[in-house]
């Protein structure tokens, strides 16, 4: 998987086949995007998934070192999706830091939330909760077992001016 957050590519490689080719393919991807006029400031590797153990691959994370290139100092960035602003921590967040594949589902939640009371379990960065609040939910409660995820969701709510309509709970929903 390669996700793009602003000017950073975040790669999560889970198979031997990709692992042995990453030193060629990841810089090539950055070069192709740059040739298209896009700014790419670095490639961050999130190779810390347990699935790598089953493939016999080492766990690790960090910037891909490409000779002659520098990468950003921060592993946090801000993105905007469907008019909602999010801080994304691609070093410590789940998977690559944000679930980009859920964009249309988040939009759907915004479209059905008006006037409702919403419970968002497993909130992570608060993405579904924020979309519900922006969609007109009367109140939203966002729950996650991770204190750092709850804190990121709080920050994202504040960034979008929604903290007065949302509660945040750090708890295991099971």
Predicted region positions:
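Helix N-cap motif at beta-to-alpha junctions
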Residues: 16-19
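Non-catalytic accessory regions of SAM-dependent methyltransferases
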Residues: 1-6, 116
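Rossmann-like S-adenosyl-L-methionine
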Residues: 69-174
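Non-catalytic substrate-recognition/targeting regions of SAM-dependent transferases
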Residues: 1-3, 21-98
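Carbohydrate-binding surface patches
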Residues: 8-13
